Amino acid sequence: MDRDILYIEMYKLFKRRRAWIGPVLVFLLIIISFPLTLDINSDNPPQIYLSFIWISTLLVTMLGTELIFSDDFEDGTLEQYAVNDQLIEVVFYKILVHWVLIGIPLAFVAFLFILSLNISIQISSIALLCLIISNLIFINFFSLGNALSLKKGSILGLLITIPFLIPVLIVLGKMTTSALLGLSLVGHLSLLVGVMILVASFIPFVISFILRTHLE
């Protein structure tokens, strides 16, 4: 793969600071505001907090990937990549860059928030790992949705991709319960990693095909 494309995509997203700082700030605002609405006498606050973080991460990741292809589609950059037979590379690198600048920072912000709740470092570290893995899954699926709805608006993409992400949220919820109960997480982690590898290996090719059909 051409690493120059990686550097270009990294520079383009880094230059649009609102595109990657904005989602992190929104996420930070959400997780700071949420405890103010929660009854401190709740029977199981750690599980509530963690479940809330999973869903918030999903929504903020959706926000952060909203324009992942649209700008390049409008200015003809995607068409140029297609002519040079580099579409799969640019899709892969766009997803990677969004994961590095948005997905991973979100995971670490959530990790610090979880630590502030007096949740054990072991559970917090597991949550961090799960967030890093799941954010890559989220970004791949939302990128797919954005590719599908490139000419039709983002609602269509959401309607298609959200159902695929519900099982991931279920697995994260099961992992939360198991971690708080001190049960083994090997099975859940293996499943999550397997899904991540499958999604990251397959979806970029699907996106590349969809983008090519838009350009024809």
Regions found by a protein language model. Name each.
Residues 1-23:
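Aromatic- and glycine-rich beta-strand/loop motifs that create alpha-glucan
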Residues 13, 62-80:
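Transmembrane helix boundary and interhelical loop/hinge segments in multi-pass membrane proteins
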Residues 49-66:
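Long, hydrophobic alpha-helical segments
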Residues 80-88:
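Short helix-to-coil transition segments within interhelical loops
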Residues 87-114:
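Selective transmembrane-helix segments that form parts of the transport pathway or gating/packing helices
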Residues 121, 130-162, 215-216:
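A structural motif at transmembrane helix-loop-helix junctions in multipass membrane proteins
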Residues 145-191, 195-197:
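Transmembrane helix segments
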Residues 200-216:
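Junction motif at the cytosolic side of a transmembrane helix
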